[in-house]
């Protein structure tokens, strides 16, 4: 099994657990904010993915959103249920995501949306696919006022320096904004050409790595600003510079 195939198998294993238990999520608790939650299903789905990875790649490390962690020269990054709040409320817009990193960045990734029966995968230098069909990102619009851009903003992140001002500029400049509740799926949709761009501050590793590789392997750009806060930005080629300039404007 290749790394790309293992990422897909692990993401599908997590998604199956979540799909089977929708409506029976068990205990739910808050993390950073009342609407930033974790359920028993999140943990069960993460276990399903991690157990498969540990069995197939016993020397690799892993990092799961819900606490699973082991060091290794390579690290599997797991978000077994991205979009938990959507999931708990019976909404679409959730997925399972697994990516593999080495010292040079992401090597392979998979994002599984069982509701739409879509599996996005990518490998470094080998392109991105959705259900086996190659993804080739179109150039997209050149200006923000023509663009469909996704974002998300948890309550604690609204307090970060400059964030509110940056969002005011986004509201003023972007043609249409979307907040679906699953950043990973939104990144997959950028890779598929369904969205023109994605921008979010202070993004966790498991919310960024799986989708970012999809975007770059489909022909887009996905980069972190490295500023404070650290904005993550992904977009079609022609839009990237315009979108990435928004957080730093005065």
Stretches found by the model and what they are:
Residues 1-81:
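N-terminal subdomain of lithium-sensitive/metallo-dependent phosphomonoesterases centered on the IMPase/IPPase/PAP
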Residues 7, 11-14, 109, 211, ...:
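Small-residue (primarily alanine) positions within well-ordered alpha-helices
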Residues 18-21, 42, 53, 84, ...:
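Residue-level signal for inorganic ion chemistry
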Residues 43, 47, 66, 80-83, ...:
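Generic detector of well-ordered alpha-helical packing
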Residues 72-129:
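DPxDG-like acidic metal-binding loop motif
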Residues 130-134:
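A structural micro-motif at secondary-structure boundaries
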Residues 137-250:
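An extended, acidic
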């Amino acid at each position: 099994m290749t790394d790309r195939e293992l990422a897909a198998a692990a993401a599908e294993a997590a998604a199956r657990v979540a799909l089977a238990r929708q409506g029976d999520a068990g205990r739910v608790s808050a993390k950073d904010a009342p609407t930033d939650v974790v359920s028993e299903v999140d943990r069960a789905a993460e276990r399903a993915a991690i157990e498969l990875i540990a069995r197939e790649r016993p020397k690799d490390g892993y990092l799961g959103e819900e606490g699973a962690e082991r060091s290794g020269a390579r690290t599997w990054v797991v978000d077994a249920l991205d979009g938990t709040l959507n999931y708990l409320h019976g909404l679409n817009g959730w997925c399972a995501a697994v990516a593999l990193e080495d010292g040079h960045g992401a090597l392979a990734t998979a994002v599984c949306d069982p509701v739409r029966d879509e599996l996005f995968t990518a490998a470094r230098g080998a392109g991105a696919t959705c259900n086996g069909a190659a993804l080739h990102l179109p150039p997209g619009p050149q200006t923000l006022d023509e663009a469909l851009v996704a974002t998300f903003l948890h309550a604690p992140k609204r307090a970060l320096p400059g964030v509110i001002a940056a969002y005011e500029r986004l509201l003023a400049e972007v043609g249409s904004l979307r907040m679906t509740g699953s950043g990973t799926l939104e990144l997959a949709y950028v890779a598929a050409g369904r969205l023109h761009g994605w921008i979010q501050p202070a993004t966790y590793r498991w919310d960024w790595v799986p989708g970012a590789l999809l975007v770059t392997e489909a022909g887009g750009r996905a980069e972190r600003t490295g500023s404070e806060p650290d904005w993550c930005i992904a977009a079609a080629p022609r839009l990237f510079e315009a979108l990435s300039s928004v957080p730093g404007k005065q």
